[in-house]
Amino acid sequence: MPRAKTGVVRRRKHKKILKLAKGYWGLRSKSFRKARETLFAAGNYAYAHRKRRKRDFRRLWIVRINAACRQHGLNYSTFIHGLKKAGIEVDRKNLADLAVREPQVFAELVERAKAAQG
């Protein structure tokens, strides 16, 4: 009786990996070994960039808030300090959204921050 090798299991595993590697260039989509290496790297990049995305968005919001503040004669750090003194708790995401979509409301917040500064 011949020895049973991992025929079905291996084929399933290889098909799964190659299916995930569809669209990759050259051997990276055809060779199991290359596909597995590439998928491993892709997973690492995806993990790192999920963390990175949070930092990138925060930076974008701060840039937008700063630009809008400077139109009203205030810089970002003074504005945030004024908001904290005034007891206004709005996160940076919403502040950036207000600065872009509702400039009048943002101007009101800037005035309140200025007033709280003294």
Swiss-Prot record:
PROSITE patterns: RIBOSOMAL_L20. GO terms for cellular component: ribonucleoprotein complex; ribosome. It holds the Pfam family Ribosomal_L20. GO terms for biological process: ribosomal large subunit assembly; translation. Keywords: Ribonucleoprotein, Ribosomal protein, RNA-binding, rRNA-binding. GO terms for molecular function: rRNA binding; structural constituent of ribosome. InterPro entries: Ribosomal_bL20, RIBOSOMAL_L20_CS, Ribosomal_protein_bL20_C. SUPFAM superfamilies: Ribosomal protein L20 (SSF74731). Belongs to the bacterial ribosomal protein bL20 family. Binds directly to 23S ribosomal RNA and is necessary for the in vitro assembly process of the 50S ribosomal subunit. It is not involved in the protein synthesizing functions of that subunit. This is Large ribosomal subunit protein bL20. It comes from Thermus thermophilus (strain ATCC 27634 / DSM 579 / HB8). The gene is rplT.
